[in-house]
């Protein structure tokens, strides 16, 4: 301990008296003085000191106002904040399907075709529905009262008919999308195609994501009253992953070169394997419900010729009675009685048809009486056997 204290006593402690000795040890060409003097002189100039002393003390305590914000310079693309990722929801806007003839009297028409099994495309005026096969030609006629302006286009778009499916986009099923049936113009996911027109343009809407096909409007040829466009439907209505048995509508619109609407019309479509059979079945079901055919406004009826099928009208017209008599040979008494009663009933019905409404009651009572006589005539008599214990 004594040796350590003696060593410390040899060196004087650092204090203000030792600062002068340390200052003398610095080299003569000191670089610190040349680098620090100019800034010190600038910060403590005589004018600044005088202004600072003459300044109002209250003003010195005030907080300086914030400088006015300058106009922000255009940020570089790399420094811009990334926009939030936009999702791809279902389309929010649903195209209108209401008929609109416009100033040019725009209407649709279809060729006449029956309900035979061999037909590939048939139109039902009562249902306003087109039945067609997959990828088969469907002629649609465009009728106008006056010629539209140059640059007019015709757009075809498919939407779902029911309200719960209207917001979804109609597209082909994955199986048919992979089929090698492309014509080089139509995208594989588009349902409707135009046949035989190289000027067809297939569009995908940016806002609604719906598919449509647009062709330039061509006036009718010489000797023709309408313009015909041949459409193809490239997926069945029953395909899983596509329409999936959901009914669809095809909306045909007439637009000018700027996209303004000039006319609109629509019809239902069913793509199936047997159009004639399906049309006949749906028309029968429609008539069984007792619903009348929807009356379209004047000028909007589809130009389809009436069908000549036997079931086209629920009530057949009565033919006038023929006065000629016929002789029918019938084998067997029972069968003869049945035909005789039927003939008498028909004769009575014809006789009472032009009389008062009470004739129907007399007709029914007459039939009951005749039926009772005929049945009692052929019934075997039933006898009660009397035994020894009977009364």
Curated annotation (Swiss-Prot):
Glycyl lysine isopeptide (Lys-Gly) (interchain with G-Cter in SUMO) cross-link, chain position(s): 384
Residue ranges, annotated region (Interaction with USP7): 357-361
Comp. bias (Basic and acidic residues): 280-292, 349-358
Sequence positions bearing N6,N6-dimethyllysine: 368, 371, 380
Region annotation Disordered: where it falls in the sequence: 60-92, 280-319, 349-391
Region (Transcription activation (acidic)) location: 1-43
UniProt key word S-adenosyl-L-methionine: no
Region annotated Required for interaction with ZNF385A, chain positions: 97-297
Interaction with E4F1 as annotated region, ranges: 253-291
Binding site residues for Zn(2+): 173, 176, 235, 239
Region (Interaction with WWOX): 63-107
Its biological purpose: Multifunctional transcription factor that induces cell cycle arrest, DNA repair or apoptosis upon binding to its target DNA sequence. Acts as a tumor suppressor in many tumor types; induces growth arrest or apoptosis depending on the physiological circumstances and cell type. Negatively regulates cell division by controlling expression of a set of genes required for this process. One of the activated genes is an inhibitor of cyclin-dependent kinases. Apoptosis induction seems to be mediated either by stimulation of BAX and FAS antigen expression, or by repression of Bcl-2 expression.
Quaternary structure note: Forms homodimers and homotetramers. Binds DNA as a homotetramer. Interacts with AXIN1. Probably part of a complex consisting of TP53, HIPK2 and AXIN1. Interacts with histone acetyltransferases EP300 and methyltransferases HRMT1L2 and CARM1, and recruits them to promoters. Interacts (via C-terminus) with TAF1; when TAF1 is part of the TFIID complex. Interacts with ING4; this interaction may be indirect. Found in a complex with CABLES1 and TP73. Interacts with HIPK1, HIPK2, and TP53INP1. Interacts with WWOX. Interacts with USP7 and SYVN1. Interacts with HSP90AB1.
Comment, domains: The N-terminal and C-terminal disordered regions undergo liquid-liquid phase separation (LLPS) following homotetramerization and activation. Post-translational modifications, such as phosphorylation or lactylation affect the ability to undergo LLPS.
Protein name in UniProt: Cellular tumor antigen p53
Gene behind the chain: TP53
